[in-house]
């Protein structure tokens, strides 16, 4: 009896270690760089900088996840779309002096149209996504250069820059501490705990699979603790960055879509077995079309955010961004074969890459070695996925 319980505990621990391996790796990397940077990595100002620097990666990675879920497909055009939308925003706002909010709406609409263009060729003409998005990468890079004519446009007005470089004000006059930020963190942590408890009660009543209890306890303690630590750290600087609100909305909305909606289930079904999904009545063409339309929409959001952070529209903006997004997805647990991956995992993957980049920069590691390290990390992450599936089979 005792042997059986020990075996069950070992099995449960092993499953949870596999499930939370990237979270454990992220914590380990943060501790390593916190020590090697002489406790500079997690100072309040640098944490704010990490959020500003990696906002575009998180936005793009969430969209890329939906493409990967459809069967391991990727979108190579997102970096060029980011650059093109930034150039379009610069042309409208700086050159043509158009209203900032109208310009933002036009840029987002342009992103949707670009996604529909890609989605049409992929879903209805059935050209492989790799080819379509490769042509998109070249096409929109060229359009960026044409729009900017090789020049960098600046500066953007303050009303636009605040979207990516501003902070929310404090409602309380506490010196050197943003109490509003701390209260928001406490409320977010409490809401998370309540939602997790009610979700587990609902699953138990319906006799659904609840997962391992150890994992549940770890999640309900660790994630609120992380939220509170981040809130406290930001409160010691300038408070909540405005871009953090954009990220929170995107992450929460897409986590809900992928976990709680029919559209989300269709994505996982398509990635699991496209033929079976089609035979079961799922409109696979529509799923592909919407996944790639959504990807370019989020690329437009990332383009607006990045242009605001850069405070200019530059011809080189967006270069290599698709690799950061793809890397964040695979490091965060998305399967190279499709059908597996979560928004939470992608968020961890994006933060992991951000901490890795920032930590190596502070330590003084050159950009050449940084690329080598990131390449090896991505390779090992995908290899871990492949080996895990082989063992399961």
Predicted features along the sequence, with ranges:
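Cytosolic-side transmembrane-helix boundaries in multi-pass membrane proteins
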Residues: 1-31, 152, 192-221, 226, ...
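Single transmembrane alpha-helix segments in multi-pass membrane proteins
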Residues: 31-35, 39-96, 120-127, 276, ...
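Inter-helical junctions in multi-pass inner-membrane proteins, predominant
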Residues: 39-49, 149, 231-244, 255-259, ...
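Loop-to-transmembrane alpha-helix initiation sites
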Residues: 53, 129, 158, 176-186, ...
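Alpha-helical transmembrane segments within multi-pass membrane transporters and channels
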Residues: 97-138, 348
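Transmembrane helix-bundle core of multi-pass membrane transporters
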Residues: 140-258
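Membrane-helix/interface signature in polytopic inner-membrane proteins
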Residues: 197-211, 252-292
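Transmembrane alpha-helical segments in multi-pass inner-membrane proteins
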Residues: 292-305, 309-372
